[in-house]
Each structure stands twice: as C-alpha cells, then as structure tokens.
Amino acid sequence: MSDNSTTKVTTNDSPSLTTTTSTTTAPTTTTTTTTTPTHNHDTTIAPGVVKKVYTSGRPPWYDSKGNLKNPLVIGVCGGSASGKTTVCDKIIANLNVRWVVLLSMDSFYKNLSKDNDPSKYNFDHPNAFDYDLMVKTISELRAGKKVNIPKYCFKTHSRLVHQDTVYGADVIILEGILTLYSKELRDLMDIKIFIDTDDDVRLARRLKRDIAERGRTLESVLHQYNTFVKPSFDDYIIPLKKYADIIVPRGSDNIVAINLLTNHIRLKLKERGFDPEKTAQLDLEGLELPSSIHVIKETNQIKAMLSILRNKDTKVGDFVFYSDRLCSLIIEEALTYLPFTEKIVTTPTGSLYHGEELNSRICALVVLRAGGCMEQPLRSICKGIRTGKVLIQSDEMKKPHLFYEKLPNVTDSHVLVLDPTIATGASSEMAIRVLLDHGVPENKIIFVSVIASLKGILYLNYRFPDVQFVVSAIDKELSDEGFILPGCGFYSNRYFGTH
C-alpha cells in the first residue's frame, strides 16, 4: 500500500472500515509513568454467549525448532471512552490465540504530586505519559523478556506497590488515547488502529466510568472534559488518524468492522508462520526419541510401582509411599546428568580411592501444586538443597497462568524442575521459561517427571532442545481434554487425598 493512501471496505449493515498508511512523523515528548496489563475479562461474543478472556501471565511464542519469534504488536488509539478496550477484548475473543498481552496506556501516567489538583490536571496531554517506559516495555516483550508492570491508581493518582509480571506473548496489544503519538513507539507496532466514536457517545461513557469507577463527581468530570479532554482530543488525538493503518468507525458497536479487522490480524499472524487454528501441533509419526529425553530402565520393580500408581483403587497411603519410592529413583537418575569431576580420597585402610564429586551448585524448582509431591524424595536425596516454587494453573480452556513465583539464587546453578506429569506441556513450558528469564541456560535445566505424554514431552523438546528430561514412563496418547492416557489421574489430588 502506498504512502497516504486510503482503502475503504463497506458492508450493507455497517459503516466502513477505513485503512490508511502514512509516513508523517509525530512530535516527540518526554515524561515518566507506570503500566498494567489488563486482567481477565468476561467478553460477550454474541447475545447470551460469554467467553472468559485471559490476558496476563503468558510465556512467549516459539517456533517448532525452539526459536523465539517476534510477537505481533498492535497499537489501538482513540479518544477517551471510545471503546478501545472493548474492541480489544472482542478481537482477542475472535482470534482465539493462545497467548495475548493487553496493556493499557492509562497505566503509564506520572505520579501526581500532592500540589496538583486532579480536577485541574490535564491527563489527556502527551506530557502526562512516559513514552520512554512504554518503548522499553514493548521492546522487551518483543524480545521475549520478562517485564514487571506497575499499577496506577486513579483514586490516589499514584503507582501502587504491587507489580504484575508479564512473560511475552503471541500478540501484544497496547491501547490508549495517544498510543500513536510517539514515532519510536509507532515503529515497534505491526498494526496501528484508530477507534473513531462520536463525541457525545464518548462523553456519556466517560461520565459513567469516572463517577462509578474512579470516585469523581459529575461537576469535576464535566469541568475536566471541557477544559482538557475535548481540547486535547482536537489538538493531539484526532491528528493521529493519519498514522493509523485501520480506522474503525463507531468503535465496539461496529461488529462487521471488528470481524474484518480480526481476519486481517489472522493473515498477519499466518505471514509469520503462526496459524492460531493449529497451535502447538506436532507430527509425531516417524520421530525417534531425542537424546535429551531419558526414560529410566523399566525393571519389574518400576513396572510394579507404576501399576500401583495407575490403579484407580490404590489408597492414599499406598499412593504416597510408592510415589515417594519411584520419585527417589527418578531423581537419582536425573542427578547422573549433572557435571562431576574426579576426586581421590583416602580410605580408613590407607588406600586411595578414585571417585567423583559434584562439580556444580544445584537447586530445584517445584511446580505447584503437583510438584510438591516430589519435594520430600528430593530432600531425602539432596541434603540442604535450595528450592523455589512457581504456582501454575490452567483455566477451563487448559491454558496455563502463572500466579506465583519465588526462586532462590539460581546464578551458576543447575536446576531440577519437579512436576510429576507432563500432559500438553503448556505448564511445563511456562516453568522452563521462568528459569530462562532468570538467566538459567537451557543446558543447566533438568526436568524431572513421573509420567509424560509423548506429544507433551516432544513439544517441550522441540522448544528447549538443550533441556534434559528424565521420566519413568511415556504414554503415547493424550485425550482431547488434555489428559494423559492411560496416565494416573490427577496426581496431586491422589497424593494429598483431595478431590
């Protein structure tokens, strides 16, 4: 598409979806700020149909060879209360992409000093935002790095102590009133969208939002709108239309335009080799087990313990006993893949013994909740080992979310990752990604599990070829619901006696 050209797509029941491109530069600014990812939303797809959309705590996207691919970055601009967030939610729901990060520009405000009256402060001026922080945040997310996102409170007009942690994504969406203002920020965007909504509609929405959600009075909202919001919209926001690739009239009410926009984003993703409809699929036919996947020798003793663990009638006490026994053997096997050096010692008889000693610091990462089942066997083998924990749980769509992480000092350490089952591999991938983001090289990670699905463990191997995997059994089947077959059921529930 040539510079400053415009293309319109019209439908019978909706205003046009306008596509434009331009190479004009924007004015530059400097400021300071904060940021927050949008949290989980219940998004209405159709009347009576609600889909929960998760937009935080996701690891970055890798191709089938384990290489990090740049995510698709989308900038959504528009006036205050134009429906930007609603449009983003509908796009996310329609895309059905596995991992999305949705960032709001509202979080990138400066702290307001006590001397400033919020009702007299222009929150719609470019100088109210920290574009340097926005550029840094988007750049690091594009590189697959972990970023800490501060939160901004509109009641106190300051940053909160708590920060959210974000781990990259397939798609990164930044929405706000002035997302297209900074040229440096625009250069990081693959798609630039402008939401064009009638002034009266935006004012009505702003009144409702600021009074109900931000503790403002009617008079203060109207004063701020007439004094700052409307003039800033005319002076700074409307001119940004010329930078947009796509203009969506009527905002979130324009369903046809949103559907066309979604299809356009799908095409952009497919151009990068990513098909949302074929996420994480592997061709397992003819594949040999890679050298980094180790299955402990299947002796009669191992088969007997696995039979007890797989048996649905096994009592809790027996399950715990044989789980601890089997995990001890698996962990012992995993320790053999650590680096050792020769050591000569003198025995009580005065003779010399040529032995080995561990040549590395080791620690462990317990993937809660099920990984806690392996912690006691680990401590019985590795005296005084330092352990960290991550809590990763899947939603009803079997997508993992990181809720908690606490790691010891992993510098120059080999790390044992403990999780008794590997099903789809999604939660395990996130656990490994946490370690990589803390500077642990792939070749210093050993993933220890009891039972893995063939698809799940191969999925992980292709993404992290230098990670070692040690298991006692690999089951070839995985149900449509993501359960290992034959498997052993919910491992943590059976170990802890919960339902």
UniProtKB/Swiss-Prot annotation:
- To which protein family does this belong? Belongs to the uridine kinase family.
Give this protein's Gene Ontology molecular function annotations. ATP binding; cytidine kinase activity; uridine kinase activity
Per the UniProt entry, the Enzyme Commission number(s) are: 2.7.1.48
Which Pfam families does this one have?
A: PRK (PF00485), UPRTase (PF14681)
Binding residues for ATP: G78, G79, S80, A81, S82, G83, K84, T85
| UniProt-recorded name of the protein | Uridine-cytidine kinase A
Identify the gene encoding this protein. Answer: udkA
Enumerate the UniProt keywords alphabetically: ATP-binding, Kinase, Nucleotide-binding, Transferase
